[in-house]
Amino acid sequence: MEYIKIAKVSNVVLHRRGTATQGTLHLTTHHLIFESPQLSTEFWFPYPLIYGVHKNPGSTLLSKLTSTNQIQLEGTDSQNYKLYQGKDLWSFVNIKVIGKDYAVFSLDFGGDLHLQARKVYDSILNLTVLSNITQLYAFIYISNNLERKLPSPDSWDIYDPIKEFRRQGLDSKDETCPWRLSTVNEHYEFCPTYPSKLFVPRSTSDILLKHASKFRSQKRIPVLTYHHKATDCNILRSSQPLPGLINQRSIQDEKLVWESFNSFCNKDIRRTKHVIVDARPRTNALAQMALGGGTENMDNYNFFLADNNMGVDKSLKLPTVTRLFLGIDNIHIVSNTAAYMTEVICQGGDLNLPLEQNLIRSQKFSNWLKLNTLILKSVDMLLKSIIFNHSNVLVHCSDGWDRTSQVVSLLEICLDPFYRTFEGFMILVEKDWCSFGHRFLERSGHLNSDIRFHDNTMHSNFNDVDTNGDDLDIGVNTQDDYAEDDEGGEDETNLINLSRISKKFNENFKLNKKSLKFVSPVFQQFLDCVYQLLTQNPDLFEFNERFLRRLVYHLYSCQYGTFLSNSEKEKFQQNLPNKTKSVWDYFRSRRKQFINPNFIQRKRSGMNEHDQNLEEEEKVEWISPDLKKVQWWWQLYGRKDSEMNDELRHKRDSVPISVDKKSKEHSNSDGGKGLNLSIFGFDMFNRK
């Protein structure tokens, strides 16, 4: 409580979704709370959800200022803002809060509350910028009645790797299974950012794994993350290799990749090629060589063509190994793109002002959709290579915990209907994001930074604004006031966007790249891609859009412990399963709210026993993204579908998004030309 300089302020005006409400503001240790007789329920906002706070001179209504220094209102607005009539809008102090979930609200403090406004601002800063995760709400949160009544298993135990791989058709205890469970990382000493249980080829020893780890960034060796039973194909994941400038190689790493590509349950399935996927742009991957990293030298990994001492019988027609650069941008590009999108969407959100269409149409704003489209394009290519070529796939980026997690998890959603179910999606997140070390704490910025806070009143002089000697008052207009200018008066009542306060808002909104260097909405971007698949296949997902939206909220709310660590090791070091609750408690206890009523129950891939008829298994429908239908997630942004997507739908076919030809590379060192992954043309497989 020592962080709270003031706990309660009366007669504060809350502006939210275009509605002004006068009431009482409360500041608690973990939430900002606003109550008013005009509200049916209290408004609660958790501090970790804060994306930015701006303390500005004047009321937020100055954003509605017209060329005549009037706030022109009509209809219901007249009653909504009646409490401002006759008051000098510059006499107020406004605190505007932008949420990581795109919620925007502002608090107006009257002329006699300036000191209280300062204390509120300082208190919010103190309660938001923290030094340790134990200060977060999750560590004192007590489950409600619904969550306490949940049946077993405990939500922390919803993902059991042995059980999950058995569902996929792999029983590690069966000696005939080509994959085994390794405990080399049982105490996280082998690789601190990997899960304790690793599935590797049965033909490899733990000694080989230890030697191979020296050749991979962060020791994140290639391991199995998914087995597709219908095609007997495997998806592996790792980090980048470490050839460096002198082009080093590792026989053990090459052996591990070879054995992984050669570990089949069904040896009779014809395979044409396997794929090593580097999710980065080609130039970025090669530039990493100067830092000791890099990408695979395909002379060493194309086992049928290479002299690599793997004991490969070259008289056999073995599948070739192809390398593919996806060209997906890094976390810094994602962060900058999301920051600009947030600025455009959230400015004026407290007053529910319309989006500026010239910004919506801009190239810079649309970059977010282009990033997502490229990810989905990449997933589409890999999906069809697995389905039609029966290819094994190894995916990595730099460290293998951002772009790699996005690609492999989306690929699994497209391949396996189980991951499109309510519980299946939770297991997927636990498997490919939490256990494989996506840095949730770091990427989400839960401990925040004071760079998010902008006090624009520190050096303000309220008298330096030219108002022609008059106060800025609310002018309440009747129907007659607008009768004469019904057609021609629009220009005179347009909003002024160039006021000093608006400029300051825009300038201060930019993130400090140094202080928040590793904060990036990577997991949110993944959820956005899942949203695209859901809207394109509305009857093939058991969960609904609201499920994804609430997951974004609880990614940042810090009410639960699931997203408060950077790895499985950190989760247990912080004792999160015992000290906090799992986020899946929230969803499982409210299941009916998040179930899609249009979901068509189908036979789930690999869910039955191993003797399940394979022909029936192959009838299970896989899905692929329709790149022409990628759209804005308007529900998340609190905007109208027409406002964000109408223009996009009109020009949908005019600017196709594709992977750069330079991103496709043949496995031979002298190739370097574009390559079709499938022996078929991809464009002919638009069916779901």
Swiss-Prot record:
Region (Disordered): 647-672
Disruption phenotype: Exhibits increased phosphatidylinositol 3-monophosphate (PI3P) level.
Top-rank taxon, per record: Eukaryota
Compositional bias annotation for Basic and acidic residues: 647-668
Reaction(s) the record says it catalyses: a 1,2-diacyl-sn-glycero-3-phospho-(1D-myo-inositol-3-phosphate) + H2O = a 1,2-diacyl-sn-glycero-3-phospho-(1D-myo-inositol) + phosphate
GO biological process, one term: phosphatidylinositol dephosphorylation
Record has Cytoplasm as a keyword: yes
Subcellular location(s) of the protein: Cytoplasm
GO molecular function, one term: mRNA binding
Key words, A-Z: Cytoplasm, Hydrolase
Annotated PROSITE patterns: PPASE_MYOTUBULARIN, TYR_PHOSPHATASE_1
Residue ranges occupied by any Myotubularin phosphatase domain in the UniProt entry: 155-637
Residues of the signal peptide: none
SUPFAM superfamilies: (Phosphotyrosine protein) phosphatases II (SSF52799), PH domain-like (SSF50729)
UniProt keyword annotation of Hydrolase present: yes
Enzyme Commission code(s) on record: 3.1.3.64
InterPro entries on file: Myotubularin, Myotubularin-like_Pase_dom, PH-like_dom_sf, Prot-tyrosine_phosphatase-like, Tyr_Pase_AS
Active site annotation, chain numbering: 397
GO cellular component, one term: membrane
Physiological role: Lipid phosphatase which dephosphorylates phosphatidylinositol 3-monophosphate (PI3P). Involved in the control of PI3P-dependent signaling and in the maintenance of endosomal system integrity.
Comment field (misc): Present with 1080 molecules/cell in log phase SD medium.
Family: Belongs to the protein-tyrosine phosphatase family. Non-receptor class myotubularin subfamily.
Protein name: Phosphoinositide 3-phosphatase
Species annotation: Saccharomyces cerevisiae (strain ATCC 204508 / S288c)
Source species taxonomy: Eukaryota, Fungi, Dikarya, Ascomycota, Saccharomycotina
